[in-house]
Amino acid sequence: MMDGFAQDWPTLTHTDNGLAMDQLGVGVGVGDLPIDAGFEPQTRARSNTWPCPRPDNFVEPVDELDSTKASNQQLAPGDSQQAIQNANAAKKNSSRRNAWGNLSYADLITHAIGSATDKRLTLSQIYEWMVQNVPYFKDKGDSNSSAGWKNSIRHNLSLHNRFMRVQNEGTGKSSWWMLNPEAKPGKSVRRRAASMETSRYEKRRGRAKKRVEALRQAGVVGLNDATPSPSSSVSEGLDHFPESPLHSGGGFQLSPDFRQRASSNASSCGRLSPIRAQDLEPDWGFPGVDYQNTTMTQALEELTGSMADELTLCTQQQQQGFSAASGLPTQPPPPPYQPPQPQQQQQQGQQPSPYALNGPTPGYNTLQPQSQCLLHRSLNCSCLHNARDGLSPNSVTTTMSPAYPNSEPSSDSLNTYSNVVLDGPADTAALLVQQQQQLATNLEGQCLEVLNSEAQPIDEFNLENFPVGNLECNVEELLQQEMSYGGLLDINIPLASVNTNLVNSGAPISNITTSTGTSLNLNQLQAQLHQQQQQQQQLQQQQQQQQHQQHQQQQLLLNNNNNTSSSSLELATQTPSTNLNARVQYSQPSVVTSPPSWVH
């Protein structure tokens, strides 16, 4: 049985176009095989939906055209036949082909409405016209097979601008559909037309690129003549800024590593990154400034703005006014913060800093100490001597102000700047923020010190020890304010407007000229002040009398309590023994006198 399998099996031959495959030989390559031209790969159409597109070189036969015209002539009698023939001739070369011919749903609806006598039809009348006049829809009038094409008709009525809806006059009736006379004639634009017409889109895109390249080679800065449509990506090769206010020096190229966005309408020239190709290096050798990271600058500007609104004290040379309510000098807010400038620019033109007293602001490598006390306005103030120890960025030395013994400790950063060596603008900005915060804290503390300190009487006021400067006092406003309080507040006026020569010479002072130019008699002022002092003294005497009376009443109460306690003690010690016996006898009934249980 096994010998039967050892026999030679017949060789099978496969013929391809009448040629046996075993006769080709083993060494013949695949490329040498004779292949029929019909087996070559065919180009796939854009859409495989029905109906299939016809070949490009296809020519319609004459009988088909005649039959199409004959079928279209049945659509509408009279004048509509010529319109249908013109539409067929216009759409003969169109790629949109339907089962009923070259006409679309919109064209059929247009002919249906145009064939009516009053040029208007309802939706049901349009359905009826389709079934009666179009052969394709004659057998599709039932509800099962008409759902698709009726839905298409409703969509075309709603989406096309050539149709307009008119409300029916009767109640409960459907609306009329009419042709819009304001609609543009010709082929209606579909929503996907821009994305489907790829050939026109590519041609337009290529023309835009060529135009940009020509302008770039010619060195033209303005692109006013280049106005392509919004759908074309004009900016894909555009890396110039023609009319930007930030780049008035002319058009310049962007960084070569800048990657434009993909072909989209959002990639316009106004949305490219405005970064130069070269780095921004300052002349003094510091690294380039990142303009996108401006949080520190914005924080400094907000800090200085808030300080200008909240603080009324600043470090200027002269004071502009005097407040009688608080006794502190008030000045206008400091100017806005300016970033530090290099030493070369400061040597060319130096301007006084809002935070310095005796000269221009030095560079940000060193900070000079102040030469005058900010609050006491004295060159020989002891605050300056105590504050010479220096200020480090990590530690702040607190001292007591000698002028106010009952005050809280305050920081030395209000009185002096330390000689701190900085490395760059970042350290300067950080130190400025720290000093401004310390300045606000110290000013608040010293304001409380002045308010809590006891006011000096007018008779103990010494003009020689008071550092008289260019202080101005509006005496009229001060008196009006004090009179409004009813004369119950103490007044402490530094005679700042008095001429220092008259004070030193000892000449009598009769009049004071205020800042408004009016003259005020000193005698009247002293009389008013004396009257206020008398009223205050009377008020103090009344308070002292009340306190004395209260003290006397308390003493009387204490004496009465002592007398009552001593009399009770005497009565207790002088009671006879009979009373004691009586009290004992009175308390005896409460004692249990019954015999014990074991007694019989």
UniProtKB/Swiss-Prot annotation:
Regions recorded as binding DNA: 100-206
One GO term (biological process): negative regulation of cell growth
InterPro entries, per the entry: Fork_head_dom, TF_fork_head_CS_2, WH-like_DNA-bd_sf, WH_DNA-bd_sf
Localization per record: Cytoplasm; Nucleus
PTM sites of type Phosphoserine: S80, S195, S264, S267, S268, S273
Keyword field contains DNA-binding: yes
S-S pairs: none
GO cellular component assignments: cytoplasm; nucleus
Sequence positions bearing Phosphothreonine: T49
Biased composition (Pro residues): 330-342
GO terms for MF: DNA-binding transcription factor activity; DNA-binding transcription factor activity, RNA polymerase II-specific; RNA polymerase II cis-regulatory region sequence-specific DNA binding
Domain of life: Eukaryota
Region (Disordered): 187-210, 222-283, 319-364, 580-600
SUPFAM superfamilies with a match to the protein in the record: Winged helix' DNA-binding domain (SSF46785)
Biased composition (Low complexity): 343-354
Keyword line: Activator, Cell cycle, Cytoplasm, Developmental protein, Differentiation, DNA-binding, Growth regulation, Nucleus, Phosphoprotein, Transcription, Transcription regulation
Transcription in keyword set: yes
Pfam families tied to this protein: Forkhead (PF00250)
Biased composition (Polar residues): 226-235, 261-270
Biological role stated in the UniProt entry: Transcription factor involved in the regulation of the insulin signaling pathway. Consistently activates both the downstream target Thor\d4EBP and the feedback control target InR. Involved in negative regulation of the cell cycle, modulating cell growth and proliferation. In response to cellular stresses, such as nutrient deprivation or increased levels of reactive oxygen species, foxo is activated and inhibits growth through the action of target genes such as Thor.
Subunit structure as annotated in this protein's UniProt entry: Interacts with melt.
Protein name (record): Forkhead box protein O
Protein source organism: Drosophila ananassae (Fruit fly)
Name of the gene encoding the protein in the UniProt record: foxo
